[in-house]
């Protein structure tokens, strides 16, 4: 008995005071994702990278909104979302306690206004994403604020309409070249 007490005093506590004191985790621990909708541009990079499909993004054309959703019950804490996010809107925290009374508490959502194409009216991207792209071009020095605003209709044109416009423009150039070559002969 004395031997057991001697060993117990020598090695101290074998357990931690976890519920009473917060438990220290490794600095590289990947816990609950923390999402900041103010920083998010709704680009969808995180939803494409998520292997567990814990992140989803749905566009409602009638409402003109894009809804981002995180289902914590599906998250495998791989940090792919954090790696691909261009604005650092989602980060994995040190928090590991995720027990909830209500299953709906495992869901996080955010809504974003969707930009509709200036030519066909189809929704295609979040307005915040377009504004972010324009701001990046201004910040890089490729455009001034005024030039960016002048080109806003180009930014707010969907890829399909841009493709159609380029094909039409390309056909005119080809026709012009053909006529020029015939006139020269």
Q: Which role does the model predict for each range below?
A:
Residues 1-61, 65, 71-74, 80-185:
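Non-ligating segments of multi-cofactor redox enzymes
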């Amino acid at each position: 008995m004395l031997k057991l007490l001697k060993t117990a005093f020598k090695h101290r506590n074998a357990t931690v005071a976890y519920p009473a004191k917060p438990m220290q985790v490794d600095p590289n621990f990947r816990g609950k994702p923390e999402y900041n909708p103010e920083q998010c541009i709704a680009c969808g990079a995180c939803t494409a990278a998520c292997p567990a499909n814990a992140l989803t993004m749905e566009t409602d054309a009638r409402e003109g909104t894009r809804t981002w959703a995180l289902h914590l019950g599906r998250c495998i804490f791989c940090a792919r979302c954090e790696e691909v996010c261009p604005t650092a809107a989602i980060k994995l925290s040190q928090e590991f306690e995720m027990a909830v009374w209500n299953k709906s508490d495992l869901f996080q959502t955010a809504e974003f206004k969707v930009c509709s194409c200036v030519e066909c009216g189809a929704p295609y991207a979040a307005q915040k994403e377009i504004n972010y792209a324009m701001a990046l071009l201004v910040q890089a020095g490729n455009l001034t604020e005024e030039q960016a605003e002048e080109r806003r209709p180009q930014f707010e044109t969907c890829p399909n309409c841009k493709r159609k416009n380029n094909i039409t423009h390309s056909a005119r150039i080809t026709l012009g070249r053909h006529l020029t070559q015939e006139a020269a002969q």
